[in-house]
Regions:
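Bacterial signal peptide processing site
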Residues: 29-32
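Residue-level marker of intrinsically disordered, low-complexity segments enriched
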Residues: 9, 21-22, 53
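Mature extracytoplasmic or organellar-lumen-exposed domains after removal of signal/transit peptides
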Residues: 46-427
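Cys/His-rich zinc-coordinating "finger/knuckle" motifs
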Residues: 34-36, 414
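Sec-dependent signal peptide recognition
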Residues: 12-20
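Short, low-structural-confidence N-terminal segments
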Residues: 38-43
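N-terminal secretory signal peptides that target proteins for export/translocation
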Residues: 1-11
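C-terminal motif of bacterial Sec signal peptides marking the signal peptidase cleavage site
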Residues: 25-27
Length: 427
């Protein structure tokens, strides 16, 4: 039995994006229409729509809002630099592992992946904020880059062997060239889940299908083979065609591509950051607060509800858990929510005000109601994803269903409390 309820109104943004994507079809693939059905609708709406602000442009509130945006831009810069440093560290650790492929080095590489991926998820809110301030052209490119950097779910059998299919995947298909251009062309060529790029392809290569038997991929599968066996010689194999050697090459190519893709997205943001700083004083406080409210709301709706909780309600476990191979979904979701808290509480204006305090001034009930829902949502989500990490031994289907519905209700309430600020801004 599945509990029935209506999807919230924000899902209706889907049609707006399809229309916009039709207009710029040459820059937006059909796959991205499906993958990013909502993200790109906000740029024109939030940056170009006229506002009838109830806040005077010279008011203290407006100057506080400007200060908070400046502070947030600095945080985005710092986070992007941290992600870049973590990715570079991952690449260095990978090089060490390729040189000496043992279990100790593999564990260090997995730890490095977790650090890099968590730092990327911590910056999730920035990407939702950027859609409101980045040009339409750059928005489309950022959406494509996001698909290349962090798409999930992936189809593991498209990458490497899986249970009962020991010869599956690009790693074992010697007809597939592993040069960077071809690997990029293979990414989502037939289906969105047929990924060859990004964090989660690396995740599967590093851990393997450990959800099946609880045993992660051994380091021996990355050990270089420098001599062919008699059977391989008779079959006319070449060293570069062997699974171990292809796996080593594949993970190296993907890592370089990830660094390249994130570097490009950072460049786009750096350019946008400079341009935005020059025109902050053209934004009213109402407009800026709406951008912040929308960024938080859409992160919760798109990343948590639409991509994960709603599919989980239909028992689509394999497609709803972000990091099943490393079993780090609770960490990733916690990082996303921590990113929201940093924006609300840690950034201060010159007068010492936080965005949280500014929101309270527009919605007196916000302080108690928002955080009650937000904190409960975080606890619910961590418990849910922790219980589902080993979904073959998880709770009963009925218990899981009720847990998912509870999380959906809490996250939806959190979004509704933010929406009240939006309403009060117009009063």
């Amino acid at each position: 039995m599945l509990l029935q309820f209506a999807l919230p109104a924000f899902v209706q943004k889907f049609s707006s994006f399809l229309l916009g994507c039709t207009i710029v079809l040459s820059a937006c693939s059909p796959e991205l229409v499906s993958e990013f059905s909502i993200l790109a609708t906000r740029s024109e709406t939030l940056t170009n729509e006229p506002t009838n602000s109830s806040v005077d442009s010279n008011s203290e509130t407006t100057h506080i809002a400007w200060d908070l945006v400046y502070g947030y831009l600095e945080l985005i810069d710092a986070d992007n630099q941290a992600i870049l440093a973590n990715l570079q560290s991952f690449q260095e650790t990978l090089n060490e592992f390729i040189t000496q492929s043992n279990e100790t080095k593999l564990q260090a590489l997995r730890s490095s992946w977790l650090v890099a991926h968590t730092s990327y998820e911590l910056a999730s809110l920035h990407r939702h904020f950027s859609t409101a301030v980045v040009s339409e052209e750059f928005n489309l490119e950022l959406l494509q880059l996001q698909y290349q950097i962090n798409h999930w779910p992936i189809l593991p059998g498209y990458i490497d062997y899986v249970d009962d299919y020991p010869d599956s995947g690009i790693v074992n298909d010697m007809t597939v060239s592993l040069d960077s251009d071809n690997i990029r062309q293979q990414h989502g060529v037939f289906d969105l889940s047929e990924s060859t790029l990004g964090f989660h392809v690396l995740e599967f290569l590093l851990w393997g299908e450990s959800t099946i038997d609880g045993v992660a991929r051994p380091a021996t599968e990355f050990a270089e083979i420098s001599q062919l066996s008699e059977a391989q010689l008779e079959a006319s194999f070449k060293l570069e065609q062997l699974g171990n050697n292809r796996r080593r090459e594949f993970i190296t190519v993907i890592t370089s591509a990830l660094l390249e893709d994130f570097g490009r997205s950072k460049t786009i943001w750096d350019q946008t950051n400079l341009a935005l700083r020059e025109r902050i004083d053209t934004f009213t406080a109402e407009r800026l607060l709406r951008i912040f409210v929308d960024a938080i709301s859409t992160l919760l709706s798109e990343e948590i509800l639409i991509r994960s909780l709603y599919p989980l309600l239909n028992e689509e476990f394999s497609d709803s858990i972000q990091s099943p191979y490393s079993k780090s979904t609770p960490t990733a979701v916690t990082a996303q929510l921590n990113g929201i808290e940093r924006l609300l509480l840690e950034i201060r204006s010159d007068s010492g005000k936080s965005l949280d305090e500014l929101f309270i001034s527009f919605s007196p009930d916000y302080e108690e109601s928002f955080y009650a829902s937000f904190d409960a949502s975080k606890e619910c989500l961590v418990l849910l994803y922790s219980s589902l990490q080993n979904f073959q031994t998880s709770l009963s289907p009925l218990q899981t269903e009720f847990d998912v519905v509870e999380c959906i209700n809490l996250v939806t309430n959190t979004i509704d409390h933010l929406g009240q600020i939006d309403v009060n801004l117009s009063n």
